[in-house]
């Protein structure tokens, strides 16, 4: 199979307004996807779904991402003009997902709505690399730091608004807020700039060669495995079973807001630090190694906690640690890929870390059903330590 590909991209001039429009779109992208997440597992429990069914629905968010992120990245590398259109289509699926949540409460339609939300998340690969083109090649860490911050900031904002809305207006109100943010994001997305627009000169390249070149990149599989593990931990706990565990402790939506805030404030601070700091490979390695160790210790400690304060402290430490891990891995992936392969590499990376988003909650749901919610945190902590030992074994490869 052969498709036309641009040989030398001609960059458009990007101004402050272009950055502002793009980041507003990013805010809507994640706000619409996460506004209901803090109470989503509680909402599913209100619908009388079992822990196993809740795990399936939570994990389904990763299914469509596994299937679509790599093909979308590959397709976008070959057909430059589709990048913006695919991102717009992602907002369309977000609108559809919100409508399904509002109109139906059966397992089938709730599952379908979450799958559509996963399709929206799959188009994030377009946004990631489009924004990387807004910066010079030497500023990959800065670009990814800003993107990660504007990923975390709307997630934190969604937690605040979700907690307040759920506590005072009911747990279905966040779905209306998701619908409004999706519609706004769709409109804003129509006005973003694509600085990698195709030139007149075009050549051909085989799709299978693109795939081979992507898979041959050094360290890509290693970074992907580490990211897959970190995302599994995140979606097992904060975006999965932490709210259910707090509910088991007798805490309500107001207390949940405190715990989520404790996680996301240091998480946002850590990601924002990449806008101002530059990390050498050795320092980056040490930071990630310590972060996985801290995450593992805190998660193993969670089942022994019963007070709101201690739950907040442990989640603050987890949030800070993961706040360093995600942008460091993302910037490494951007740096090891050539300009020609950036989208397909990012698609591969995001597609396979979505395995963690899928398998993590799925297995956690089974564990919770068999041995209780404490087992969920033991499993998540074990995953964090597994990543820690992988990094120890690959120290020379990661530093060089």
From Swiss-Prot:
Keywords: Cell membrane, Membrane, Transmembrane, Transmembrane helix, Transport
Transmembrane segments: 20-40, 47-67, 91-111, 115-135, 149-169, 172-192, 222-242, 256-276, 289-309, 310-330, 345-365, 370-390
Pfam families, sorted: MFS_1
Record's GO cellular component terms: plasma membrane
Compartmental location: Cell membrane
Domain of life: Bacteria
Annotated InterPro entries: MFS, MFS_dom, MFS_trans_sf, MFS_Vesicular_Transporter, Tet-R_TetA/multi-R_MdtG-like
Keyword Protein transport among UniProt keywords: no
Primary location class: membrane
Coiled coil regions, renumbered to chain: none
Membrane topology qualifier: Multi-pass membrane protein
Gene Ontology terms for molecular function: transmembrane transporter activity
Family: Belongs to the major facilitator superfamily. TCR/Tet family.
Name of the protein in its database record: Uncharacterized MFS-type transporter YxlH
